[in-house]
Regions:
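A short beta-strand-turn-helix
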Residues: 1-14
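Short pre-active-site segment immediately N-terminal to redox-active cysteine/selenocysteine motifs
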Residues: 12-13, 20-23, 66
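Hydrophobic beta-strand anchors of alpha/beta hydrolase catalytic cores
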Residues: 16-17, 47, 70
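Typically the conserved alpha-helix immediately C-terminal to a functionally engaged Cys/Sec
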Residues: 28-40
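Structural microenvironment flanking redox-active thiols in thiol-disulfide oxidoreductases
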Residues: 52-59
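Structural micro-motif
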Residues: 62-71
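Non-catalytic, surface beta->alpha helical segment in thiol-disulfide oxidoreductase systems
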Residues: 72-100
Length: 100
């Protein structure tokens, strides 16, 4: 999984990753919201809800310092990130704003 995601990050397609753990309550709150984002704009951006324990190298590479943490990649570069718990609308707005 980690290799697959890394490959997508380096492509031209936008990639949104929500870094989480299963025992993080705010992370769990974000899961349904992230699914709504995926349903709304999944044809324009790859969306992953990723447990850092299953992708420790990627989490380290992205310098994940708090959870949940969302990181948006576009053309291989980090173009936006947040540690905030956001609404579907706020996430979509930021994704579209940073990938146009």
């Amino acid at each position: 999984m980690e290799f697959h995601i890394q490959k997508n990050i380096n492509s031209k397609e936008p990639v949104l990753i929500n870094f989480k753990t299963n025992d993080c309550n705010p992370c769990q709150m974000m899961s349904p919201t992230l699914q709504q984002v995926k349903n709304a704009i999944g044809n324009r951006v790859l969306v992953y809800n990723l447990d850092i324990n299953k992708a420790p190298n990627l989490a380290e590479q992205c310098q994940i310092s708090a959870l949940p943490m969302m990181v948006l990649f576009f053309e291989g570069q980090v173009v936006w990130q947040t540690k905030a718990v956001l609404s579907k609308e706020e996430i979509i707005k930021n994704v579209l704003e940073h990938t146009q």
